[in-house]
Design a protein with these regions (language model features):
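Short loop/turn motifs that connect adjacent beta-strands in outer-membrane beta-barrel proteins
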Residues: 29-37, 84, 125-134, 176-177, ...
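Detector for outer-membrane/organellar transmembrane beta-barrel domains
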Residues: 37-39, 45-49, 157-249
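Outer membrane beta-barrel transmembrane domains
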Residues: 54-56, 63, 205-310
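Surface-exposed strand-loop-strand hairpins of Gram-negative outer-membrane beta-barrel proteins
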Residues: 47-72, 154-156
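Outer-membrane pore/translocation modules
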Residues: 99-207, 254-258
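Residues that define the transmembrane beta-barrel architecture of outer-membrane proteins
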Residues: 69-73, 110-117, 133, 160-164, ...
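Residues on the lipid-exposed face of transmembrane beta-strands in outer-membrane beta-barrel proteins
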Residues: 43-45, 75-79, 89, 117-121, ...
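Transmembrane beta-strands of outer-membrane beta-barrel pores
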Residues: 45-51, 91-97, 123, 141-147, ...
């Protein structure tokens, strides 16, 4: 087996899934807040694939399993607890598989991944020169919903450990609809249990428990609202950098202890219908341009959103 970037399964999807707030989208990474008692349900479909991966920093071609593919369906809801405090909940279902050249075959995996909860609060929202400056903070927690095997790389549907996230967000939006946004997050991860009692991580460990490396998450966006705030277009960058971990050893499978880093660039579009009111649609595409111990993956996604009052 070759490495599969399961670590970003939640990140990429949660970045781009959204709710609607008076024709505006909301994610854990943006600067938009829903009003109190407003809710929005979103359903996202995402497909990703790769046939190359980084073994450490060396780029290899998948030989035995060729192209690794992942499909995900994720329901999500965003709730306006207060005007300045929102709750977001997501529960993705993931299926992985690969093509099988040379007569080889490896079974994929499927199931619900992690239950993810996030609270987003608005700290500052004020006029500054000809635009608006917004500062926000997000705290999140995710935990496995099922007893999936995290050490089955590249097919594992997740890294199998609890995660706490702490994120700061800053956005400056101009009057004509252009905006720039940046976000920085620290992702603190726990341990996952493997179905073996020995592994190597820069040394021998005689235990089934593996430390999943914590990581820093970077996000930068440039976007614009068009058509009377009914169409939003964005170009974005996403980066992940683990704070510890080991490299994949030559011709060995990846494991949850690996030090994963990657840089992705992408585009997205979101459109909100005037009638029926509260309905929106989204699409996005992203590509991994650099990485370490991860697949050189591309992905696209589509989704629908519906806003309603509680």
């Amino acid at each position: 087996m070759k490495n599969r970037n399961t670590i970003f399964t939640f990140f990429i999807s949660f970045i781009l899934c959204l709710g609607i707030n008076i024709s505006h989208a909301q994610t854990p990474f943006d600067a938009i807040m829903m009003n109190q008692r407003e809710s929005c349900l979103a359903v996202i479909y995402e497909h990703s694939w790769f046939d190359e991966y980084w073994e450490g920093t060396y780029l290899r071609t998948n030989g035995t399993i060729e192209t690794v593919k992942r499909d995900m369906v994720m329901p999500m809801i965003a709730i306006g607890v207060f005007d300045q405090l929102n709750l977001l909940v997501a529960a993705p279902y993931v299926k992985t598989e690969s093509t099988e050249p040379n007569g080889g075959y490896f079974a994929g995996a499927k199931g619900f991944q992690d239950l993810s909860l996030a609270l987003k609060g608005q700290i500052i929202n004020k006029q500054l020169n000809s635009g608006t400056l917004s500062l926000l903070a997000t705290v999140g927690f995710s935990t496995p919903m099922t007893n999936y095997l995290s050490d089955y790389r590249p097919y594992s549907i997740g890294f199998g450990a609890n995660e706490f996230s702490f994120r700061g967000i800053a956005q400056y939006k101009m009057e004509k609809g252009f905006y720039v946004r940046g976000a920085l997050a620290y992702l603190h991860r726990g341990q996952t249990e493997a179905e073996r009692d020995y592994y190597y991580n820069n040394g021998s460990y005689y235990t089934a428990w593996m430390d999943v490396p914590s990581a820093w998450n970077y996000n930068a966006v440039a976007g614009v609202w068009l058509l009377n705030n009914s169409l939003k277009l964005e170009a974005n960058y996403l980066g992940i950098k683990s704070t510890s971990g080991d490299d994949i050893r030559p011709y060995n499978a990846a494991q949850p202890t690996n030090k994963v880093s990657f840089d992705q660039v992408g585009i997205s579009a979101q459109y909100y219908l005037n009638k029926p009111q509260g309905i929106g649609a989204l699409s996005y595409f992203s590509h991994t341009i650099n990485g370490r111990n991860t697949g050189k993956a591309s992905m696209f996604g589509v989704g629908l959103t519906y806003q309603f009052k509680i």
